[in-house]
Amino acid sequence: MALSPPKIFVEDRQVPLDATSDPPALFDGTTRLYISYTCPFAQRVWITRNLKGLQDEIKLVPIDLPNRPAWLKEKVNPANKVPALEHNGKITGESLDLIKYVDSNFDGPSLYPEDSAKREFGEELLKYVDETFVKTVFGSFKGDPVKETASAFDHVENALKKFDDGPFFLGELSLVDIAYIPFIERFQVFLDEVFKYEIIIGRPNLAAWIEQMNKMVAYTQTKTDSEYVVNYFKRFM
């Protein structure tokens, strides 16, 4: 079954909470998603929330990570990072776990297929994204990204050929696309701006996938300013 378009819900970005901010009324029955507007890991869960139409059910709590409040570690997440989800009296962290949790525990269109072959391939891709893909591309910034990332981007290109019933990794839009897009979004901007390397050249499936993702308001509302991405990623060079 095709994913139904989520309701259009335009949100104003609230000022992030910092070291001077009081905490929200924790565990008062409100479901809260603690994020940073610029964190790709948090963006995964933010996109999932939006695609499932949960803007009313899950309240965003933006955090200023460079000047984060002490209560983030003391009262919310002992790891002192985002994303973190406050739901049913407990806190859950780690982005790949959270996108599955939100998909399974809240109403809205399912973002993971029932088909066993697709689920198996999806799990392979979810393992690859953080363990190999992200590390490989970040590691290339000190060397030659064109050579050092070719296998990683080719892996993505080939994965997008696996199923022919849609332009996404598993055919239809799924959690796998949500896991990859925050990083590919940033890598595309940074590699083009700094190294003049356009990752979609010679990769038509990747190009088509990015084009489709950019048609989704639920995703585009979460994107990070390109200038910020370039300046932030330069620290890894």
UniProtKB/Swiss-Prot annotation:
Residues 29-110 form the GST N-terminal domain. Coiled coil: none annotated. One of its GO terms (cellular component) is cytosol. One of its GO terms (biological process) is protein glutathionylation. Its main location: cytoplasm. Pfam families: GST_C_2, GST_N_3. It is an enzyme of class 2 (transferase). Induction: By glutathione, ascorbate and auxin. Glutathione binds at C39, P40, N67, R68, K81, V82, E94, S95. It catalyses: RX + glutathione = an S-substituted glutathione + a halide anion + H(+). It is found in: Cytoplasm, Cytosol. Keywords: Cytoplasm, Detoxification, Stress response, Transferase. Residues 112-232 form the GST C-terminal domain. Catalyzes the glutathione-dependent reduction of S-glutathionylquercetin to quercetin. In vitro, possesses glutathione-dependent thiol transferase activity toward 2-hydroxyethyl disulfide (HED). Belongs to the GST superfamily. Lambda family. This is Glutathione S-transferase L1. The lineage of its organism: Eukaryota, Viridiplantae, Streptophyta, Embryophyta, Tracheophyta.
